[in-house]
């Protein structure tokens, strides 16, 4: 009998790919991960995502598939939906979107017509590409109007947003961001939306784990529809979800995702999401979320003590954004220097940034991944000082900079050797 599938392990079948995966594992273990949109998933999540469900095509929804053999696919998707609804206190949910961008596009397809007016946060002030940015479909297919933050405080100006809404009469208002570290007044957003007859979309991609744990305001009472990724503070596999308490909106979203935006769902990823949602329902996840915020506030404290300008003056979440202009350093130069020494973050635009997007005047840090690893305030205090040492070294002599870099490499290794992924 001839079989055309292999029973051999990856390391025996494809040494090139196996080496790349091994190298990436070593990189994650040996560096400090401070990118706000990344996290470390559990072994159980990895096992579910690498499961036999990767073989199954399950086009459609539970109980209404286009293919046979979907009994267990239905069970696993229903588990994911039930756990998600319990986690966020919502009535309806779609767990099939492949990404946060597709989740947002699915909402647009469900609720808007091309040319409708959409109000969202501008990219440089902390918004996401899908919130109406010009290069995105959201900026090309719709009349996108962007709100900004207050120039002096860096905070969302709700009065300015209300004036914008009254002036432009949008069909949809988006509350949410990708680099705004403060709480969001979802109640006020809904009041503004009601004044102009608009839908309110809350994009909580960055804050979802904190919302689920009660450490960040929940939009469930106010938003018509909520989107989120599942791989940031929620600590699940990559992908996204859509939630609502409105059955009429739910039905529109179901058809906009399938067959509107996607074909077959990724059942192995949905299985992994179900595991992650189950983990987030456990009491210890609340402790994890609390520690995330303690750690980010520790970074803020150190940065401010060392003379870094923290955008908005602080944080209420996992994110910290710093303005490097007072240091006469660009985000690009700083992030490359940090990466060389094993500290991974991202260059980031600051509000009204004069620099180009691939240069930027700022950095964005996130505490979720290293909190998953077990680091707490004492370790984040050390990280904060290392970051400041590296930034300050960029304006010193070569000899001084080399000495600082060697010291930071040693201190990074001490932390990563102690706290394994």
Curated annotation (Swiss-Prot):
Record Pfam families: SHMT
Kinase among keywords: no
InterPro entries associated with the record: PyrdxlP-dep_Trfase, PyrdxlP-dep_Trfase_major, PyrdxlP-dep_Trfase_small, Ser_HO-MeTrfase, Ser_HO-MeTrfase-like, Ser_HO-MeTrfase_PLP_BS, SHMT-like_dom
Subcellular location field: Cytoplasm
GO molecular function, one term: pyridoxal phosphate binding
Catalytic activity: (6R)-5,10-methylene-5,6,7,8-tetrahydrofolate + glycine + H2O = (6S)-5,6,7,8-tetrahydrofolate + L-serine
Pathway of action: One-carbon metabolism; tetrahydrofolate interconversion; Amino-acid biosynthesis; glycine biosynthesis; glycine from L-serine: step 1/1
Keyword Nucleotide-binding in annotation: no
Residues binding (6S)-5,6,7,8-tetrahydrofolate, per UniProt: 123, 127-129
Names of required cofactors: pyridoxal 5'-phosphate
EC numbers: 2.1.2.1
One GO CC term on file: cytosol
Function: Catalyzes the reversible interconversion of serine and glycine with tetrahydrofolate (THF) serving as the one-carbon carrier. This reaction serves as the major source of one-carbon groups required for the biosynthesis of purines, thymidylate, methionine, and other important biomolecules. Also exhibits THF-independent aldolase activity toward beta-hydroxyamino acids, producing glycine and aldehydes, via a retro-aldol mechanism.
Family classification: Belongs to the SHMT family.
Subunit structure comment from the entry: Homodimer.
Protein name per UniProt: Serine hydroxymethyltransferase
Source species of the chain: Ehrlichia ruminantium (strain Gardel)
UniProt lineage: Bacteria, Pseudomonadati, Pseudomonadota, Alphaproteobacteria, Rickettsiales
């Amino acid at each position: 009998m001839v079989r055309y599938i292999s029973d051999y392990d990856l390391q025996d079948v494809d040494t090139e790919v196996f080496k790349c995966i091994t190298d990436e594992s070593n990189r994650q273990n040996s560096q400090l991960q401070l990118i706000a949109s990344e996290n470390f998933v559990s072994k159980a999540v990895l096992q579910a995502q690498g499961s036999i469900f990767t073989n199954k095509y399950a086009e459609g929804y539970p109980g209404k598939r286009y293919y046979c053999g979907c009994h267990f696919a239905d069970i696993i998707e229903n588990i994911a939906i039930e756990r998600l609804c319990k986690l966020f206190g919502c009535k309806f949910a779609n767990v099939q979107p492949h990404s946060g961008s597709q989740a947002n596009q699915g909402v647009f397809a469900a609720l808007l017509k091309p040319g409708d007016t959409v109000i969202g946060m501008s990219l440089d002030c902390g918004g996401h590409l899908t919130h109406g940015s010009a290069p995105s479909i959201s900026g090309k297919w719709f009349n996108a109007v962007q709100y900004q933050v207050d120039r002096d405080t860096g905070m969302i100006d709700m009065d300015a947003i209300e004036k914008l809404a009254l002036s432009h009469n949008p069909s949809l208002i988006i509350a949410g961001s990708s680099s705004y570290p403060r709480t969001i007044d979802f109640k006020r957003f809904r009041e503004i939306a009601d004044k102009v007859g608009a839908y309110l979309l809350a994009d909580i991609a960055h804050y979802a784990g904190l919302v689920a744990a009660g450490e960040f305001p929940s939009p469930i009472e106010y938003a018509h529809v909520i989107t989120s990724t599942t791989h940031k503070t929620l600590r699940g596999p990559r992908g996204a979800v859509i939630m609502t308490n409105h059955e009429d909106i739910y039905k529109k979203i179901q058809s906009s995702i399938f067959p509107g935006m996607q074909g077959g769902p990724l059942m192995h990823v949905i299985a992994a999401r179900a595991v992650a949602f189950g983990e987030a329902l456990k009491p210890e996840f609340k402790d994890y979320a609390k520690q995330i915020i303690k750690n980010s506030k520790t970074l803020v404290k150190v940065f401010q003590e060392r003379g870094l300008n923290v955008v908005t003056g602080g944080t209420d979440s996992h994110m910290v954004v710093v303005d490097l202009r007072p240091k006469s350093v660009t985000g690009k130069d700083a992030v490359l220097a940090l990466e060389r020494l094993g500290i991974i973050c991202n260059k980031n635009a600051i509000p009204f940034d004069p620099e180009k997007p691939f240069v930027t005047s700022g950095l964005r840090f996130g505490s979720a991944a290293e909190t998953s690893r077990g680091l707490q305030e004492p370790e984040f205090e050390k990280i904060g000082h290392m970051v400041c040492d590296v930034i300050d070294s960029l304006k010193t002599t070569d000899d001084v900079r080399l000495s600082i870099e060697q010291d930071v490499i040693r201190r990074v290794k001490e932390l990563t050797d102690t706290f394994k992924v």
